[in-house]
Design a protein with these regions (language model features):
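Ferredoxin-type iron-sulfur electron-transfer modules in oxidoreductases and energy-metabolism complexes
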Residues: 13, 17-20
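A glycine- and small/hydrophobic-rich beta-loop-beta segment
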Residues: 150-160
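Canonical Radical SAM [4Fe-4S] cluster-binding loop centered on the CxxxCxxC motif
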Residues: 1-13
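Conserved SAM/AdoMet-binding glycine-rich loop
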Residues: 24-147, 158
């Protein structure tokens, strides 16, 4: 946030018009992208929340799927969770960056939430949308991170059981307070922690992905498969990739696909 500058919100009418144009062109899925979508609308002349914007987009004929990212845990509202619960179009996937499971490190990062708030939020989301896929971002080796802090992160990973996680080794970023902090962590310690985290994340991801094998689910076909011309590639509502036999005329269509085999990060259908 120090480097990216202040949030700015596009006018809702402008967004709706663009979505309507896309729908008229045959687009069935849209992605709403923002540094923090949950802060949307606060600086508009006529304030509108992100939850209200989603409700308006839901009304657009032709749009079958709505995705959004990124959601900052500090201001993901109960209203947004309620809209997700009642929506027929919002995809069953939420990217909810954790960064660290240690409340002490989160405070140093100026994240404005703590471990307890994050876990309570996950419980609320799962109660509202039980089949939602949760993904996250985690940084290992932030200045001052102790072994106890790292274990707090591992504890959150085990409790939340993410469908997948983007794991990063901390690197100094010019213009951020952390770049000049003392207590920079030795590289060998960071590497060892990163490897432990990655192993845990991958184990949980594989267990969760395997649970869908054998089910028939809706897949939006996105493209011809790059490796095998007899296959097309699509995506489940939960954002998982599926490869299946198909032809180019299927691109842009939503089809029911039986998931025959889980290959770790993708399915064969």
């Amino acid at each position: 946030p120090y480097v990216r500058g202040r949030d700015r919100s596009r006018e809702p009418k402008e967004i709706i018009r663009e979505v309507e144009r896309l729908a008229a062109d045959g687009v069935v899925e849209i992605m709403l992208l923002g540094q923090n979508v949950n802060s949307y609308g606060k600086n508009l002349e006529q304030p509108m929340t992100f939850a209200q914007l989603l409700q308006e987009i839901e009304k657009v004929d032709g749009i079958e799927r709505i995705r959004f990212m990124t959601s900052h845990p500090k201001d993901l509202s109960d209203d947004l969770i309620e809209v997700m619960k009642n929506s027929k179009k919002i995809c069953k996937h939420l990217h909810l960056p954790l960064q660290s499971g240690s409340s002490r490190i989160l405070k140093l990062m100026n994240r404005r939430y703590d471990k307890e708030h994050y876990l309570e939020l996950v419980d609320k989301i799962r109660a509202a949308v039980p089949d939602i896929a949760l993904t996250t971002d985690i940084i290992v080796g932030f200045p001052g991170e102790t072994e106890e802090d790292f274990e707090e992160t591992m504890d959150v990973v085990r409790k939340v059981r993410y469908d997948s996680a983007f794991t990063f080794i901390y690197s100094k970023r010019t213009g951020t307070p952390a770049a000049v902090m003392e207590d920079q962590i030795p590289e060998d310690v960071i590497k060892a922690r990163f490897d432990r985290l990655l192993k845990e994340v991958q184990t949980i991801s594989a267990e969760k992905a395997g649970a869908l094998t054998g089910q028939t689910l809706s897949v939006l076909i996105e493209e011809k498969n790059e490796q095998d011309a007899s296959l097309v590639t699509g995506r489940l509502s939960n954002n998982s990739v599926v490869h299946l036999p198909g032809t180019e005329d299927m691109i842009g269509k939503i089809v029911n696909v039986k998931l025959l085999e889980c290959k770790g990060f993708y399915y064969m259908g």
